[in-house]
């Protein structure tokens, strides 16, 4: 054992010997690239701030896609034609969306697919959630999407949701946002 290691615990020595030493990427990044990373990060934070639910994320994604030239599948169905390079999207139940660009080569040569999903941390109401106790009404809930039970006290409380009435009318709810 080296003289400088004699005061280190066995655990520390094992960590140094077996553990991965992570280097910060910021050490090697150029000032120009740091600005680009900051801009992308800021855009992502704005998206996360505005997209609290799947429905909000779908709407935001479609708005961005339309600015980039994407059109809904219905547009192409009406025209009856789709061409190589066309940018298409399709929304399903306002909670999922698919984007694709029609390839310029035949499908026999393959295709490139990128997949992602929307995972909005939240509390969901359970089926038949309403109950009464001690002259108060309560909802039975469960948490979803990576929410940490112990983090909620440090986050401003807000309620976002969608109610679909019997007649099909949709009401969007947002309470508690600044």
PLM-predicted stretches and their roles:
Residues 1-178:
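N-terminal hydrophobic/helix-forming segments and targeting peptides
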């Amino acid at each position: 054992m080296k003289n400088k290691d004699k005061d280190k615990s066995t655990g520390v020595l094992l960590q140094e010997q077996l553990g991965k030493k992570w280097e910060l990427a910021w050490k090697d990044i150029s000032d120009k690239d740091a600005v680009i990373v900051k801009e992308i990060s800021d855009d992502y934070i704005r998206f996360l701030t505005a997209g609290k639910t799947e429905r909000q994320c779908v709407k935001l994604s479609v708005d961005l896609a339309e600015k980039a030239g994407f059109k809904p599948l219905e547009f192409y169905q009406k025209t009856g034609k789709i061409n190589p390079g066309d940018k298409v999207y399709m929304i399903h139940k306002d909670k999922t969306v698919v984007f694709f660009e029609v390839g310029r080569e035949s499908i026999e040569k393959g295709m490139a697919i990128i997949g992602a999903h929307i995972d909005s941390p939240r509390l969901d109401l359970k089926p038949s959630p309403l109950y009464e106790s001690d002259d108060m009404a309560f909802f039975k809930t469960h948490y979803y999407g990576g929410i940490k039970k112990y983090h909620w006290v440090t986050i401003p409380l807000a309620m976002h949701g969608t109610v679909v009435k019997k007649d099909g009318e949709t009401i969007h709810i947002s309470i508690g946002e600044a």
